């Protein structure tokens, strides 16, 4: 009760201070809906803020302002506004706004995702850029990804005629791909009931939910020290559970490297240990590599499978391309340059269903001007990648799934075309983008080449529900269940 009383007093004090002083000095903010006293626009937002932001952009334009408690939030919903934030003013707007739930000791300051652009951040990104995600490393590991896809097909062949929650199969496959890239071994046994894959996924998704759940301290920063609803504590517990999954493997490797004659495996763990990274840095880095490399990619592939299920003509066209180029052998990553329709299908999936609907929020290091509006120092900035991908001013028939729009098009998602930014852009662009592209394309191609599938209980594709579950990543709700069968 004492904590609640102190917190209530903090809300009242911070609100009074804002009413007295908070609105002065920034008379040229972007327009936006009128805020209510104290809470601002908080109560005007629902369960799908990305969709609401896109609607607000139709009224207020490329960039608009929301008051979230005492915090000022600027939202960009067009490619031109995104370009200003992610390119023109990339350095000034490169700081990270960290959700209170994620401010766990030892994590934020060692995080590629959440820390500011410090020397530690630069060193960690350098390790990723020069060791893990180089073209040479990606190509050298292609056979591992292809082998795991073959194992996935073998598993699904054993499930013919049964309902399969496809995202769990995808997730387990991706975890083992990353496990081999990082530890040179599988993490879980695909399909085994006690393999731990589901537990790992639940930890990750719960953390993503907590990051986007309502936390009064995000809107009234004076409450930050109290952790009123235990969200920071729960994130810390999730991290502890995740670290335990690979902790034994990490400790075993440390001991092995101390033995004379140790033969380096040349995997990412060896690189981390040889680079002198401490346990906090290694755990934070592995957490984000597994999290970003599995959860976001799994969601994207599930969305691709959903769209292909709803659009059998597109599936047939993709399958025909694979048959023409690849023939009877298994598709390989080296085939990708000759598979333009596969590339277009991946792009179209990322346009309609970006893995992170709202790019992780940035924070202004200095006051600057965007599109003739003032963006104050410490303002929170959000870029609505979901809304930009569906902007009718940019895309013809934007709600229709049509890979053809990307055939003979130079538009790409590598951070140079601001109409398609599922992985962000600028210095905060996802460092794992090159390998994520390989994951997504390979698994989609493997499904289409090797499997036929239908919906359970004779359900028509016309009745397939395509709803979104909003979080830091965008999941399909309800999950996609299919009944696999081998292709004749």
Curated annotation (Swiss-Prot):
This is (S)-N-methylcoclaurine 3'-hydroxylase isozyme 2. 3'-hydroxylation of (S)-N-methylcoclaurine. InterPro entries: Cyt_P450, Cyt_P450_CS, Cyt_P450_E_grp-I, Cyt_P450_sf. It comes from Eschscholzia californica. It is a single-pass membrane protein. It catalyses: (S)-N-methylcoclaurine + reduced [NADPH--hemoprotein reductase] + O2 = (S)-3'-hydroxy-N-methylcoclaurine + oxidized [NADPH--hemoprotein reductase] + H2O + H(+). Belongs to the cytochrome P450 family. Pathway: Alkaloid biosynthesis; (S)-reticuline biosynthesis; (S)-reticuline from (S)-norcoclaurine: step 3/4. The keyword Metal-binding applies. It holds the Pfam family p450.
């Amino acid at each position: 009760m004492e904590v609640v009383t102190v917190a209530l007093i903090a809300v009242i004090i911070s609100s009074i201070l804002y009413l007295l002083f908070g609105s002065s000095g920034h008379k040229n903010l972007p327009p936006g809906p009128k805020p209510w006293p104290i809470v601002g626009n908080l109560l005007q937002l629902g369960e799908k803020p990305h969709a609401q932001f896109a609607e607000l952009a139709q009224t207020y334009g490329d960039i608009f302002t929301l008051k979230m408690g005492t915090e000022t939030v600027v939202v960009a919903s067009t490619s031109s506004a995104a370009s200003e934030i992610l390119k023109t003013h990339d350095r000034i707007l490169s700081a990270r706004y960290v959700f209170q739930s994620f401010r766990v000791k030892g994590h934020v300051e060692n995080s590629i995702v959440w820390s500011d652009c410090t020397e530690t951040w630069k060193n960690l990104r350098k390790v990723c850029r020069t060791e893990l995600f180089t073209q040479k490393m990606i190509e050298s590991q292609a056979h591992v990804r292809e082998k795991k896809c073959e194992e996935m097909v073998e598993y699904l062949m054993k499930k013919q005629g049964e309902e399969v929650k496809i995202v769990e199969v995808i997730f387990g496959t991706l975890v083992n791909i990353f496990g081999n890239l990082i530890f040179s071994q599988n993490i879980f046994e695909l399909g085994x009931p006690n393999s731990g894959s589901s537990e790992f996924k639940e930890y990750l998704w719960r953390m993503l939910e907590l990051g986007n759940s309502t936390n009064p301290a995000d809107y009234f920063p004076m409450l930050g020290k109290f952790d009123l609803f235990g969200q920071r504590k729960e994130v810390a517990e999730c991290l502890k559970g995740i670290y335990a999954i690979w902790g034994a493997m990490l400790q075993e490797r440390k001991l092995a490297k101390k033995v004379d004659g140790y033969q380096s495996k040349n995997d990412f763990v060896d690189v981390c240990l040889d680079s002198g990274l401490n346990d906090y840095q290694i755990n934070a880095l592995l957490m984000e590599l597994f999290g970003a490399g599995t959860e976001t990619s799994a969601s994207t592939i599930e969305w691709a499978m959903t769209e292909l299920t709803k659009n059998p003509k597109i599936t047939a066209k993709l399958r025909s391309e694979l048959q023409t180029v690849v023939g009877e052998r298994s598709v390989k990553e080296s085939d990708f340059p000759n598979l333009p329709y596969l590339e277009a299908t991946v792009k179209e999936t990322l346009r309609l269903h970006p893995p992170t609907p709202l790019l992780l929020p940035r924070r202004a290091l200095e006051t600057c001007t965007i599109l003739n509006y003032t963006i104050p120092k410490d303002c929170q900035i959000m870029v609505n990648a979901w809304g930009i991908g569906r902007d009718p001013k940019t895309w013809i028939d934007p709600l229709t799934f049509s890979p053809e729009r990307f055939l003979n098009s130079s538009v790409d998602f590598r951070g140079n075309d601001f109409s398609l930014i599922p992985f962000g852009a600028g210095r905060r662009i996802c460092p794992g983008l090159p390998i994520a592209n390989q994951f997504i394309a390979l698994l989609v191609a493997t499904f289409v080449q090797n499997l036929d599938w239908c919906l359970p209980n004779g359900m028509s594709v016309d009745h397939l529900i395509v709803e979104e579950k909003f979080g830091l990543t965008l999941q399909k709700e309800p999950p996609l269940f299919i009944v696999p069968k081998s292709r004749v």
